[in-house]
Amino acid sequence: MAGHSKWAQIKRQKQAADFRKGQIFSKLAREIHVAVREGGPNPETNVRLRMAIERARREGMPKDTIENAIAKASGAAGGAAEYETIVYEGYGPGGVAIMAIALTDNRNRTASVVRHIFSKYGGSLGETGSVAWQFETVGQIVVATDGHDPEEIALAAIDAGARDFEVEDDSVIITTDPDQLSDVAEKLEAAGYQIRQADIQRIPTTTVELEGGQAQSALKLLEALEDLDDVQEVYTNASFPAEVRSAV
């Protein structure tokens, strides 16, 4: 796959460049809301909420905004919408698999918009389970090298219970079992490493290399899904050539 980049790499580059910060905050507030509704407002006993708060802090979300999101979801403040999680699965140009995870207060609205985006860029929305089997759910931690030897970070992660690692630019991407994510992240942070991101991800078991027009169309489809306020995460098994990556 020399010269090609995975969608996850492209997303991390965009986030590092501080793109769409307001939209990121909006999505994080929704995640906090759902976490509170499912497990209560105490991050000590609610792992999903604790992870959402940690991610919000790493993204620079103000403390007051985090606290307001928790208060709204717990009923201490009025005006809270009710969200449900919906997973959309489909195919993009070149037959690549795509998953979009949405938190929505209107499933009909979201389904209509998602279907339109798939169609607009040469894809098709599929049935539940149509592509999920092509992905594995893992914990993923992005650690800044920040002057440290990447191998040193990787060894510390393995000692803390991580499964695997990959060095990427100025980061080390750590993979864990989902239930080990929080524990490994806490140990790395306690050891003095800078955690840029720690969350549950769906990674493709194999990738499909795209070229030319198919790569351009697939990237536009993925970015259009990412731009939807209702969509929290987008995953694909596509990989993209360097010229498409540099155009992002």
UniProtKB/Swiss-Prot annotation:
Cytoplasm listed as a keyword: yes
Similarity comment: Belongs to the TACO1 family.
Membrane-traversing stretches: none
GO molecular function, one term: DNA binding
GO cellular component entries: cytosol
Subcellular location: Cytoplasm
NCBIfam families xrefs: PRK00110.1 (NF001030), PRK12378.1 (NF009044), YebC/PmpR family DNA-binding transcriptional regulator (TIGR01033)
Organism: Thermomicrobium roseum (strain ATCC 27502 / DSM 5159 / P-2)
Keywords per UniProt: Cytoplasm, DNA-binding, Transcription, Transcription regulation
Protein name: Probable transcriptional regulatory protein trd_1132
GO biological process, one term: regulation of DNA-templated transcription
